Amino acid sequence: MAGIIDLASLAPTDTVLKLPHPYLTEYTVQRSDDKLFQLHPKEGSTVQPLPFALHAPHVRFSAPADLKSSELPASANNSLWARSRRSPFSDVRWESDAAAPTLAQAWLLLYVLFTVRPGMELVRLQLSGPGADVLSQQLREVLLGIAHPPPPPKSQAAAPEQATTETSSTVVVLRSTFWQGAGSPFGPRPVWCPDASPSSLPASTPLSQFPTTPLQHTITVASAGDPQDPDRYQQSLHPIRPAKPAPGAVIYSRWVPHLKETFSMVSVDYTDAEHLRLFHEWQNDPRVSQGWNETGTLEQHREYLRKIHEDPHQVALLAKWDDAYFAYFEIYWAKEDRLGGYYDAQDYDRGRHSLVGDVKFRGPHRVTAWWSSLMHYLFLDDPRTMWVVGEPKDTNAIPVMYDLIHGFGLEKFVDLPHKRSALVRCPRVRFFQLCPLGAQEKAVGGVNIGLVPKL
């Protein structure tokens, strides 16, 4: 299967996982006996010290493995019990004289398991050691997992999971809740979304330390964006939006295993010379201007970015691989956007526009990584976002195909003032069912319907 990493094939120095910004700690796995592994931080890799020990050197675990075909439930049985039994399992053990791993340490182990087997919707953790029952309960209470369900009455002949005791417990871990941030160890924000507060708040009390921005509606009257009728406006009723991240803040960071690089997004600072230079050079590239039509002088581009900076419904971003900037994105709240006038927009729908400025970073193996990461951020940033939307030109097949790969559906066609667009939408539930964060096949997300090879 695509994306699977064989733990046994990794050298002791190979990085299996790297934490997001600002820590960037790398981890390796080493064999402890014939079938079990231990996780170790790579010496000298940490950029910012962790607030606590995140790895448990005394814990051993097995690579995710599947039951023998003779042990699997009948394929016609699609109960939660049967789906759990068909999911891979991992043995997690610690000695009788050792403390159980903390919830944060268990989270790190799960991050490794979902990295080496990204296709697992569920994984059964078989916990063995003192305090296994408490750790199992903690995993359930932060919704990283659920109790292993009992077999249905007609399946009682099947062997049930071992009963929970103080030293033994089985918990079914959910990929969908893991990637939504369940159990993230560094505060209320999911680990891939560093605290990106407005500049007015001190670092000691970032925006995430306050309750989620309350719901309070307002009315916006804005240009309808019609070049044939510049005096036409549209009105929208929408929530007052959360404060925007400070210019220059890293708002998303994730290590991409198949590239062995960290993808990050940074809030654009229009007063920063490098940020302005990149935007200016890319927009004046004929390849980019064909789609964006934003060629101009340095001053015109500074003014363009300044207006976005002052617009509560938009955020301008630069994206990078490790330390190399390669792309520019604009993300927006859809209800008060031009697009919001063309469909029944929900209060927290979000959309995005993108361009790759550095041609060295083109290609499907990279596009699928940043495409999914940008969607991931939009769903994580505010848990009330139920839909991510887009409006690529109806004749521009490539972005529509990438959208289909990552869980979007084609809703309808809309006639914007300057183009006919395909209105595409991806619901939150579908994105986290698919979790398309690894290397993706050229097929419609979740089904084996192939797409044309020109990607």
Swiss-Prot record:
Enzyme class: transferase
Pathway terms, separated by semicolons: Siderophore biosynthesis
Gene3D superfamilies: 3.40.630.30
InterPro entries in the cross-refs: Acyl_CoA_acyltransferase (IPR016181), Acyltransferase_MbtK/IucB-like (IPR019432)
Major location category of this protein: other
Domain of life: Eukaryota
Keywords of this entry: Acyltransferase, Peroxisome, Transferase, Virulence
Outcome of gene disruption: Leads to increased sensitivity to oxidative stress and iron-starvation, reduced conidial germination as well as reduced virulence. Impairs the production of the 6 siderophores beauverichelin A, dimerumic acid (DA), Na-dimethyl coprogen (NADC), fusarinine A, fusarinine C (FsC), rhodotorulic acid (RA) and tenellin; but increases the production of mevalonolactone and eleutherazine B.
MF term (GO), any: N-acyltransferase activity
Compartment list: Peroxisome
EC number: 2.3.1.-
UniProt motif PTS1-type peroxisomal targeting signal: location: 453-455
A GO term from the CC aspect: peroxisome
GO biological process, one term: siderophore biosynthetic process
UniProt record similarity statement: Belongs to the lysine N-acyltransferase mbtK family.
Annotated function: Hydroxyornithine transacylase; part of the gene cluster that mediates the biosynthesis of at least 11 siderophores, including beauverichelin A, dimerumic acid (DA), Na-dimethyl coprogen (NADC), eleutherazine B, ferricrocin (FC), fusarinine A, fusarinine C (FsC), metachelin A, mevalonolactone, rhodotorulic acid (RA) and tenellin. This cocktail of siderophores for iron metabolism is essential for virulence, and more specifically for the fungal virulence in penetrating through the host cuticle. Siderophore synthesis is also involved in conidial germination under iron-deficient conditions.
The name this protein goes by in its record: N(5)-hydroxyornithine:cis-anhydromevalonyl coenzyme A-N(5)-transacylase SIDF
Gene behind the chain: SIDF
